Amino acid sequence: MAQGEVLEFEEIVRTRQDALLRTPPGLVPDPVDAQDLLQTALARTYGRWEGIADKRLADAYLRRVMINTRTEWWRARKLEEVPTEQLPDARVEDSTEQHADRALLMDAMKVLAPKQRSVVVLRHWEQMSTEETAAALGMSAGTVKSTLHRALARLREELETRDLDARALEREERERCAAA
């Protein structure tokens, strides 16, 4: 690779580092896996940097590599048990309530199919447009919209179920205390 292209790649990584660091925790629950995912995506992208015609789409290319790598990992680990208690660390500036909400949402996202989860992460956490998300995932804008609609409906359903379960437990506890 020519020195100019190496510098160009380094500059993109340096200037887009905050955005790049936000994507992996939405794709994999373990913070260590998230770091590995980003590292792998950067290494793979670096190896193919000369072949990328439009360098302005580097973010989308890197996200696509992360999604593909995550999919490869899931296929390889398909038969292994996935721990549900591991959640990514929240940023220090989050309040306790925001941290709890984020942890609840991350846990609830585990019910989504990988494609649905990818669409939710790119559209809502990365705040990509429908068209950008479609390009990053290699699908049509209509598919992004319908997948997002189904994913959000499934998340609402999951969160409502959890809320009803929590209320039932609170009611049982009050009844137990009143009877004692």
From Swiss-Prot:
Chief subcellular location: cytoplasm
Record localization: Cytoplasm
Cystine pairs: none
Alphabetized UniProt keyword annotations: Cytoplasm, DNA-binding, Sigma factor, Transcription, Transcription regulation
Entry GO terms, CC: cytoplasm
Annotated motif Polymerase core binding, positions: 36-49
Entries under Gene3D superfamilies matching the protein: 1.10.1740.10, Winged helix-like DNA-binding domain superfamily/Winged helix DNA-binding domain
GO terms of biological process kind: DNA-templated transcription initiation; response to stress
Gene Ontology MF terms in the entry: DNA binding; sigma factor activity
Residues annotated to bind DNA: 130-149
Entries under CDD domains matching the protein: Sigma70_r4 (cd06171)
Recorded superkingdom: Bacteria
Job description of the protein: Sigma factors are initiation factors that promote the attachment of RNA polymerase to specific initiation sites and are then released. This sigma factor is required for the synthesis of the antibiotic actinomycin.
Family (UniProt): Belongs to the sigma-70 factor family. ECF subfamily.
Protein name: RNA polymerase sigma-E factor
